[in-house]
Amino acid sequence: GLEVLSVDPAQSDWAAQLHGVRLAFIALHGPGGEDGSMQGALQTLGIPYTGSGVLGSALAMDKKRSKQLWQGIGLATAGFVALTPDSDWQGIIDRFGKVFVKPACQGSSIGMSSADSANTLRQSFELARQYAGEVLAEQFVDGPEYTVAVLGDDALPSIRLETDSEFYDYEAKYVSEDTRYH
């Protein structure tokens, strides 16, 4: 059998608790757990772990750099722009139309909202920057939403997501019992 140890990285002695551990099963979500930080710490400690490596985790959490990488290898991605307090709000709406505004390095749709005017874009920016230093406005793409998990070199079957919300937000992901998966 296996001996399992639960370790909370919020505790100051979490690294010391890992002494003698042969494998870490990472069950953390969001910044600090999915962004390469924990993966890097475990790698530094010489402890093998489950899931993606440091670089893959860091890129997956960073929407801006992921999109730049995809563009660099010729993959299609929705148009986007990094927002700052001095952004040309109306110019962005004129260029993209409706956009989704999101923290660049956050998950679970936290801090994410839509905007279809200069005023709502500015408000969405203020909301998103509460959760991350970098904020993106991404062009709205109309159509069904799918998710596909990749395990090793294999893509698992796609899942179509349906929600009564405007988009697959935090509520639809974790709270609502009305979200449908096909």
What does each model-identified segment do?
Residues 1-55, 59-65, 72, 84-91:
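ATP-binding N-terminal substructure of ATP-dependent carboxylate-amine bond-forming enzymes
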Residues 4, 15-19, 59-144:
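Active-site nucleotide/adenylate-binding loops and adjacent lid/helix of ATP-dependent enzymes
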Residues 30, 109, 164-167:
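Glycine-rich phosphate/pyrophosphate-binding beta-alpha loops
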Residues 35-37, 110-111, 147:
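Short glycine-/acidic-enriched loop or helix-start segments at secondary-structure transitions
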Residues 48-52, 77, 157-158:
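Short hydrophobic/aromatic-enriched beta-strand-loop microsegments
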Residues 116-182:
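Phosphate-binding site of ATP-dependent enzymes
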